[in-house]
Amino acid sequence: PGFKVVMYDTLEDFYLAEALEYVDAWKKSTPDNPVGICGPIGPTEQLPLVARLVNSLGLSLRSAHFWGMDEWHDGKKEVSMKHPLSFEKADRELCFNRIDRRLRMPDKNLHFPKADTKPYVDSWEGVCCAVMQGGQGDIKHWAFNDPLPRKGKWKNSPPLPKEYRKLGTRVVDLHPVTLAQNARTSGGGNITMVPQKAITVGPQETWKAEKVSIWQAGTHDSPFGQRLTTLMISEGLVDSAVPMSLLA
């Protein structure tokens, strides 16, 4: 119940439908009942379409909110927007800077994860997240909710789903598969460019969203990965070694 798979005939239709989720969420927002969306970097093709739709419709976003899902961490703090892979930079350049200033939400309504996670976590209170969008990584993550390292108390078995679901926004060490994927998709194959840590939204915030929406155009995880997580979610087969299955 509550889980469905939607197929699109063309990439154009796919990314337009993804962009419309932003618009549909923001249309519900009012000053008394603000509404937002939590969105990914990967995919990104929808972002310029979002800006174009907002401008064409003349949709005021003054009360609307946006949460970034994650950001790179350089070992000391979040990377700046000068970093070539900065997610905040991508969101702003591909979407928000393209929205007419008269329509754009105030900067205080844009929430990007930082090394000090408290302001980001607090921003989820009092605002409705209509939808959390995401992609699926090779390691079966959403955001950077990778499988936890198999060491210490998790050496012989991964954490129980109920334990993993307690995790909130946090700084994480990234799985080697995630590093390789981002080098391939974003770094031109240069794995040394990819930070080994990140700040990610957690299951705690994910479960505050009214809906979780995962978009897969075939450029990130493999067909096998898509079929695997679809099967696990539809059958209620939950295992924290496959983080996407926790969405069941």
Predicted regions and their residues:
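N-terminal glycine-/serine-/threonine-rich phosphate-binding loop
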Residues: 1-37, 55-56
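ATP/nucleoside-binding phosphotransfer catalytic cores, i.e., glycine-rich phosphate-binding loops
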Residues: 3, 8-10, 18, 200-248
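Class I SAM-dependent methyltransferase SAM-binding "motif I" and its flanking Rossmann-like core
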Residues: 143-195
